[in-house]
Amino acid sequence: MFSHSFENDDHLNELRERLCRDSRDSLQLLRNFQDNPICSVVLDEANRCITVLWKQYATKAQFRYIHENLLTLICKHRVCKILGDDTALPTVPSEDRVWIIDKWFPRAVECGLRFAASKRPASYFGKIAVGHIQSAAPVGIECRSFEQLYEAKEWLDTVAAG
């Protein structure tokens, strides 16, 4: 099972330092990972699921800080499902998409993430970005996108936690 290495701790510390010098939104993210101007995160331990509601665009540092903390939750609580409300996500820059695909997904799968479902973004570029990420998901994780959040949740409720 994956455990956070010193390298990952160094990466998180570097991201924290960057965010400290960043915007007010970044400072609020540092103060409250679960509810801030960029996203809200809810852990449902009983169903081994994390729900992420994106509220606005995330800078590279914000995006990676959020995902590193999601990874910590996935590993610590043996989360196997993630539900995303991507409605307000305007886009994900290509550099961050590649990072998710090449760096984050493999670690999340190693920790036990098996299913990801999301409500499609409202913006055209958000839809393209999320579609690219989901289509490049590695073996071991099944990703689906839906027009409505309740459809994504219903699908996650049908898959085995295994």
Language-model segments: residues:
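Amphipathic, Lys/Arg-enriched alpha-helical "gate/interface" segment within cytosolic domains
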Residues: 2-162
